[in-house]
C-alpha cells in the first residue's frame, strides 16, 4: 500500500489466483480501480512507487517473454556441483534456504527479473526500463532523478540475497 505524494490516492496490490494486480483508490470518490492485469512482479520489495506527478506509478512487471520455472525433478543440471573445502576454519555463517545448484540460479533469475513500466491512472502502461533484476528504486527529493538498484551475477550459494552483488 502506498499513498500518492499529494495524499489523494492510494495504490495497492491485489493477489489473485493467477498473479498480482495493481489497483488505485481515489480517496475523495471512495472508488477503487484496477490499473493492471495480474502481471505485477511482487517477488521482492515494493512492486510499485508513486512518481511526483501524482498521476503515474512506476511498476515492476513480469517480462512478456518470461520462461517457465525449471522443475528440479525433470530438468537435470548440466554439470556437477563442486564445492571446495580445505578443512580450515571459516568466518562464514550458515543460512537456510540458499541457492543450491544451477537450476536454483536459473529459477532465481527468472523470478527476480522485471520490466519497469510507468502506469498512469487510466491504466495505460509504458515501458520505462527493459528487463533486469530490479531490487529497489529511490526518487530524489525533487522527483527529477531516479536511482535503481539491480542484483548482479554471480550468485552465491553461501550468502543470502541481501549480500549478493548489486549495482
Where are these regions (language model features)?
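Beta-propeller folds
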Residues: 1-167
Amino acid at each position: 500500500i502506498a499513498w500518492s505524494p499529494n495524499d489523494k490516492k492510494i495504490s495497492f496490490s491485489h493477489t489473485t489466483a493467477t498473479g498480482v494486480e495493481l489497483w488505485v483508490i481515489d480517496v475523495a470518490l471512495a472508488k477503487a480501480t484496477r490499473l493492471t492485469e495480474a502481471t505485477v512482479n511482487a517477488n521482492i520489495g515494493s512492486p510499485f512507487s508513486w512518481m511526483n506527478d501524482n498521476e503515474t506509478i512506476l511498476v515492476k512487471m513480469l517480462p512478456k517473454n518470461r520462461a517457465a520455472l525449471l522443475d528440479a525433478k525433470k530438468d537435470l543440471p548440466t554439470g556437477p556441483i563442486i564445492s571446495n573445502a580445505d578443512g580450515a576454519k571459516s568466518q562464514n555463517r550458515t543460512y537456510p534456504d540458499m541457492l543450491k545448484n544451477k537450476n536454483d540460479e536459473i529459477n532465481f533469475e527468472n523470478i527476480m527479473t522485471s520490466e519497469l513500466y510507468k502506469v498512469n491512472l487510466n491504466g495505460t502502461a509504458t515501458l520505462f526500463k527493459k528487463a533486469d533484476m530490479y531490487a529497489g528504486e529511490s526518487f530524489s527529493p525533487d522527483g527529477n532523478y531516479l536511482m535503481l538498484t539491480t542484483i548482479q551475477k554471480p550468485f552465491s550459494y553461501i550468502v543470502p540475497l541481501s549480500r549478493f552483488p548489486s549495482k
